[in-house]
Amino acid sequence: LECNKLVPIAHKTCPEGKNLCYKMFMVSTSTVPVKRGCIDVCPKDSALVKYVCCNTDRCN
């Protein structure tokens, strides 16, 4: 699986076991992602951050 990094033109191949792509947003500014990459389990939302996940190449 390949996931985008924070800069959309950059991407990386995910390591074994991390087979979801994610975008992380601050809850207060939920339109601008602050982090992108590979993740193993989703979602991991909290009071401050929100994750949006998907499982196809570079879908984040």
UniProtKB/Swiss-Prot annotation:
Gene3D superfamilies: CD59
Keyword annotations of the record: Cardiotoxin, Cytolysis, Disulfide bond, Membrane, Secreted, Target cell membrane, Target membrane, Toxin
Pfam family, one: Toxin_cobra-type
Disulfide bond annotation, renumbered to this chain: 3-21, 14-38, 42-53, 54-59
One Gene Ontology molecular-function label: toxin activity
Location of this chain's protein in the cell: Secreted; Target cell membrane
Physiological role: Shows cytolytic activity on many different cells by forming pore in lipid membranes. In vivo, increases heart rate or kills the animal by cardiac arrest. In addition, it binds to heparin with high affinity, interacts with Kv channel-interacting protein 1 (KCNIP1) in a calcium-independent manner, and binds to integrin alpha-V/beta-3 (ITGAV/ITGB3) with moderate affinity.
Protein name: Cytotoxin 9
Species per Swiss-Prot/TrEMBL record: Naja annulifera (Banded Egyptian cobra)
